[in-house]
Amino acid sequence: MKTNTDLFEKVPVPKAVATMAIPTMISMLVVVIYNMADTFFIGQTQDPLQVAAVSLATPVFMIFMALGNLFGIGGSSAISRALGEKHKERAWHISSFCCYGALGLGVIVAIFSVFGMEVILRLIGASENTIGFARKYLLIISIGAPTILFSTAFANILRGEGAARESMVGNLLGTIVNIVLDPVMILILGWGVTGAALATIIGNIAACLFYLQYFLRKKSTLTISLKYFKIGGGIARGVVAIGIPASLNNILMSFANIVLNQALVGYGDTPVAAMGVAMKSNMLVVLLQIGLCVGIQPLIGYNYGAGNKKRLMQIFKFTGIVSVVMGTILTLLMMAARKTLVQVFINDAQVIAYGIQMVIALQLSAPFLGILFLCINTIQGMGKAIPSLVLTVCRQGLIFIPLIFILNHMFGLEGVIYAQPAADYLSIVVAILICTHLFRNMEHRNASVEE
């Protein structure tokens, strides 16, 4: 598409970043609302145990989304580089592979999750008080896993070809359906967590149908035709090489949340509910910064594939400045509204007290968190699988999880609460070091070519 080619190659950097990032940020804002909806309406039941159950189940839902990102982020990176290299048919093979790969893995995940439900419930730290609610919620989410993987994957695939607006519309449609159904199913029909899960899956089905019609009406330069499905020729390897680090990041994040919840359970169900509410509130800050950085990944990938290193660096620097400014503004807003944000979800005195402290703790690293996501998405956009994997493992595996145990042992509940911002700052340092190394290598290669 000529318009998308101009966007990647010629449009001024601020406008190109805005064109790609704003729809993605709106999509992430939609994800924030989407994730808050279940907790908000469950909170209106004034039952902390149901709120805690949904909080405990959230990491499993995030793992399903992470597996969708295996094909979504991996496919988006591979597609944008293929288009930058003018290999259009290769991009078709990639999009078809991602379509059927996401659906196939979704079916496998659904089967294993349903039959392994009791094991999962114990792993996420469900107590005798919350296990019944968590089981009801997760059973429906597990059955709907194929729709979660597909909608997550193709929200990213569309961005890979520059169709950020269409990606946003699909996300928005799914969220609107979820939000409309939540109060009906949770409160009016009195289905509680079961209603929340059903609304979530129906919302995902709506998003899937939108993405399918986008391809079937041939609005895309890509295809999901089965005749272009291909695993060999580096297609699967190219997607998985970037997709695994990207999905591993979210899987480790979910696993870290499980470890965090297990540490909090030692202090009762109330801190678990409070942390769930605090993290939902903090999603506004985190996901808007992720949206900015995910939005520019196709620009990075295309210009890296096209060999335009100067434009790549301009995009990186401009996005870095925007992320810090935006992160600072969002942090100030969160600090000012911290009590209101917690009360919106549930009006329980103990949950509110813990929740306010947790919101404050999570804001300590928020102004600079965008730098971490910028480095991650730049590395993924460049197709650097090993550095991406290293950074991913460092962030959630080697830093956050050990800090939970260490700080819990040293400072008790206070230590658990402040483990996240401490891990964030250490991760930012590692990310900057890795990106600096890659940029220096890129400059050396350019100098060698010129000589």
PLM region spans:
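Transmembrane helical elements of multi-pass membrane transporters/channels
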Residues: 19-38, 140, 174, 203-207, ...
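Small-residue-rich hydrophobic transmembrane alpha-helices
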Residues: 51-111, 148-167, 274-332, 336, ...
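Helix-terminus/linker motif at the lipid-water interface of multi-pass membrane proteins
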Residues: 29, 33-51, 121-128, 184-191, ...
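Alpha-helical transmembrane segments of multipass membrane proteins
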Residues: 36-40, 111, 119, 153-157, ...
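Short runs within selected transmembrane alpha-helices of multi-pass transporters and secretion channels
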Residues: 141-159, 167-175, 196-209, 290-293, ...
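Short alpha-helical transmembrane segments in multi-pass integral membrane proteins
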Residues: 1-21, 79-146, 188-244, 300-365, ...
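N-terminal transmembrane alpha-helices
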Residues: 8-40, 44-45, 59-74, 78, ...
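Residue-level hotspots within pore-lining transmembrane alpha-helices
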Residues: 30, 34, 64-68, 108, ...
